[in-house]
Amino acid sequence: MQDFLSFIVSMTKITISKQMKTMKKNYLGIGLAAMSLLAIGCTKDYSDDANGMMALYSFDEMMSTIPEAGGDKFDDFTDNPFVKTTDEPVSTFSVDADGASYAIMRRYLTYGYNINPSSVRIEEFLNYFTFNYTAPKGDDHVSIGAEVDDCPWNTGHHLLQLGIKGKELTADEMPRANFVFLVDVSGSMNSSDKLDLLKKGLTELLYQLNPDDRISLITYSGTVKKLLESTPVSEADKIKKAISKLNASGSTAGGEALKMAYEEALTNYDPKCNNRVIMGTDGDFNVGVTSTDALVEMVESYARKGIYMTCLGFGTGNLNDAMMEKVSNAGNGTYHYIDCENEMMKVFVHERSQFVSVANDAKCQVSFNPDYVSEYRLIGYENRVMSNADFENDKKDAGEIGAGQTITALYEIVLKKDYWDTFNDLTVSNKNLVTFDFRYKKSLDGPSIPLKATLTADMPFNKYGRPDDFYFAAGVAAYGMILRDSPYKGDATIEMAKSLVKQGLSFDPNGYRAELLKLMDKKNEQPQ
């Protein structure tokens, strides 16, 4: 009898395996695997049933049915090079508050995929995490600071860290919300790690809002539908009922739907509100306005009218990361990738205040003193580099910073060999190593507010100890360069990156830093 049961189970597994491998659009494998992932978080190790029960379909077999990550679309880019200060001593870039690239990396490692180097944007790895920077004071909406110390992966080089923090808002200071939920219900979203997860997130967000906040709900697949007119959160049951009815089928008329969502936001526009379109999709815009350039142009036009954008990406194998990053940047918004319930809670609950922009068109300009610095390299921010002339051009769009959000940037710098002699030379009047200028607007149509921070040329030699955040940032950057196989990674190794990250665990309010250490132990075909 036991042999007979084993035979039946074996044949059943084979039959299911054959059927599932041909169901390319059903994604049952994703559903089964994702349900396990979502129940316990993002980085748990998975194996056979812990209770010793015979699994009808093993984890490895389920993983084999998941769509290949090769279908995901990323823009290729080249790492920023070293620049000689004799050629150009000034570097300018827009802030980037996204964290999608880090969550995509976590998804790939969790599912056993190799990392696509083009998916690794080091600035988004850094800005996924909250840093323990000094809060703004008085009427300022932003604080800035800088540190410099030895570069761990290049002996003789130094690392410059720029730290930026947005003003935190109390519950009473939060502006009223005018949110339009724009939900992709096309067939490709029919998965527990896509539409089901998005529905959970939108429902969780409701619990964070105030009764007088307002929600609209628009869906798109082959057609565009307005499921819910602008409704106050005081009628939460009505909103939750509309969310519960979301089901996936059809193709994707994304461009048409996006326009309707913006028009809905404009209809209920209030200059005192947080007017925002929150779009959830796997990025498969295959019907209607599909050109990324056309979408960007449309989004920019509504951004100028005061409507912000939050882009939420879901799933693997169909993710159009390139489109979502460009659209969110153009829409005065942010781009998040939701790979699990923990990430959904991070975005919709723990960091929900970051949906409110406290600094608009935020730009950084770093001036290196050629008397002391021979070369520098901005690590990351490749698609946010700006012309130096645009720094003081208030009409030039730049990035936004959410309430309580921190932004981090790193430069690798090479000091001149006669550095100390120059510093001691009394005829050299400028003793500044670096000048960090920053500009932002409190409101989209307001004036730019300048901030400035300087580091004196003796700073690299004051070995009084650096904040733990400095070492953590260095570890994150080293890990990102390893995953990208960057030509500038120098002597960086996984063990070096882990050691640096461990030094930054004293500040870890939600456990995200500790999670990074676990991810570093996961196998990727990465150079050591």
Task: Show which residues each predicted segment covers.
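Bacterial N-terminal signal peptides that target proteins for export
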Residues: 21-30
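C-terminal motif of bacterial Sec signal peptides marking the signal peptidase cleavage site
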Residues: 38-41
